């Protein structure tokens, strides 16, 4: 067995952990069997966070967690775990992000299962070529003619930091949106002028 180091590319590396997809791909290319992922908690216990559980589910491997403060180990394995709440989730690409929180809202509030959409394994690949405009119609969301007549449950396609349509939020009524930005916690926020101007397209679910 060997240990293959991978970079943490999260913006806040003290609070978040995100594997570098290029390092991960290089590890896979070596041809050996991947047994799991090892990472540390600088402060606090080795108890798996929701982000650890979500990451383990997403990549399909155990997470071995070491607490630097307490000098202890823990492990979490894929088991079908899902985040218990729509609010306060840690961001994990493909498992807890802007799209999955919308899918989970539809399941929890309307008992609607949005079909699985196969996305790139890394956020970097997705940001280079966002696919929401092509995927939403295939998932039974109809594009609306205007962005100023939104209703509860509408998906708002927004311009991201790279000037591409790479972020989605859900309008939940009362001038509020539910969304999950990269490397932040999922939250409800006021649909203010900044978000209104960022919204370029609106999609409505039509069974």
Outline where the language-model segments fall:
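Active-site-adjacent structural segments surrounding the nucleophilic cysteine of cysteine proteases
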Residues: 78-89
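Conserved beta-strand-loop surface patch within small alpha/beta domains used
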Residues: 1-34, 42-79
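...with weaker cross-activation on analogous glycine-rich loops/strands in unrelated enzymes
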Residues: 120-187, 191
């Amino acid at each position: 067995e060997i240990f293959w180091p991978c970079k943490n590319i999260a913006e806040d590396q003290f609070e978040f952990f995100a594997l570098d997809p290029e390092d991960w791909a290089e590890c896979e290319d070596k041809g050996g069997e991947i047994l799991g992922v090892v990472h540390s908690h600088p402060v606090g216990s080795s108890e798996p966070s929701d982000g650890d559980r979500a990451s383990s589910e997403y990549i399909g491997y155990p997470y071995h967690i070491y607490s630097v403060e307490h000098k202890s180990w823990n492990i979490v394995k894929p088991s079908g775990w899902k985040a218990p709440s729509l609010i306060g989730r840690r961001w994990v690409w493909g498992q807890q992000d802007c799209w999955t929180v919308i899918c989970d809202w539809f399941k929890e509030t309307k008992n609607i299962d949005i079909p699985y959409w196969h996305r790139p394994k890394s956020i970097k690949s997705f940001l280079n070529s966002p696919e929401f405009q092509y995927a939403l119609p295939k998932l039974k969301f109809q594009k609306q003619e205007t962005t100023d007549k939104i209703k509860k449950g509408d998906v708002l396609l927004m311009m991201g930091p790279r000037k591409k349509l790479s972020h989605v939020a859900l309008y939940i009524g009362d001038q509020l949106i539910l969304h999950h930005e990269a490397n932040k916690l999922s939250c409800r926020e006021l649909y203010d002028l900044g978000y209104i101007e960022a919204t370029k397209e609106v999609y409505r679910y039509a069974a």
